[in-house]
Amino acid sequence: MRLYLCEKPSQGKDIAAVLGAKTRGDGCLRGPGVVVTWGIGHLLETAPPGAYGDHLKNWSLDTLPILPAQWKVIVKPKTASQFKVVKQLLKEATELVIATDADREGEMIARELIEYCGYRGPIQRLWLSALNEASIRQAFSSVKQGAETYPLYLSALARSRADWLIGMNFSRLFTLLGRQAGYTGVLSVGRVQTPTLRLVVDRDREIANFIPKPFWNLDVQLCTAGHSFLAKWVADESVTDDEGRCLDQSAATAALNALQNSQMATAISVETERARDSAPLPFDLSTLQEVCSAKFGLGVQETLDVAQALYETHKATTYPRTDCGYLPESMLDEVPMVLDAINRTDPTIGKALLLIDPEQRS
């Protein structure tokens, strides 16, 4: 039996539909010779310090640092029933296809189950960038060998264990030091959250301590040989700050008066630069969140929820959490349909759409 292991139920249903696996089972879908099952995100998690000994259940400086010699994982209680399904199917499977999200976290979700359940059969990897039918069929035609993506699992595993080591050890350390100083709460420390908090605090302090200083710019529209251009007055260094801005109003006023009286100016420096702007790539998640926050006031999680729904439910976008900004070639055949939809939505850009080469590849 060939088992397809997906990351979430919605993903499993999309893949099962293409495979013809229509018979609903307990936590899976079955078809001729195939079974599609899924996790609900991670079904396993790294064990807490107490799992390595009763002496680590209580917080004490004497037990730090906690450095597991042999790492342990445990089944997440909330999804234990689905774990049992996956474990049993892995026992029955003669071959396995990992069909989780195409990133290192998706790789880890599958690989940690494979190791925990002791599956030793052949492994292939279905690399999906989108969940529309054409992309799924394209992925089926170019299935990878499991060894090709195994390093992604090692990367995710290193990240996970680094998070654990930093979070568990430093949270205990600073909480215990805080208690010695009279603080009774928990001081949470994290590999990502603590540096991010530092950036926010530093920026907040900069804003609080900022002393506004007025400065004066002088931009002049000049004309020579029938051509006009915008020139910028450069003040003497004695009256400018580190960014070259003039801090002396009288110097700026004097320069303005001199220009108005003479009607002549000399360009002392001319810079010419030839530049080529490439078309922007599709959004990655962080850029999408920045734009949605600035334009629509959406929070980070709200933007992620919308992006996930567009990917999983509506099949309108590609996988939102990928680091790659390029679309899969399997979607090239859909370009004319997408351009037509854009034209019908906003006919004012119809002429611009005619200039697009629908066959172009990056």
PLM features: residue spans?
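Glycine-rich loop/turn
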Residues: 1, 163-186
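Intrinsically disordered, low-complexity regulatory segments
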Residues: 1-168
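Conserved phosphate/pyrophosphate-binding and hydrolysis machinery centered on Walker-type P-loop NTPases
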Residues: 5, 76-79, 99-104, 130, ...
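Helical mechanochemical/support elements of P-loop NTPase systems and associated helical scaffolds
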Residues: 11, 15, 78-89, 105-113, ...
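A generic secondary-structure signal for well-formed alpha-helical elements
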Residues: 19, 23, 117-121, 144, ...
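Short, conserved phosphate-binding/catalytic loop or strand-edge motifs used
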Residues: 129-135, 285-286, 306-317, 321
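Extended, highly charged linker/hinge segments and catalytic-adjacent loops that couple domains
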Residues: 149-156, 163-169, 175, 313-362
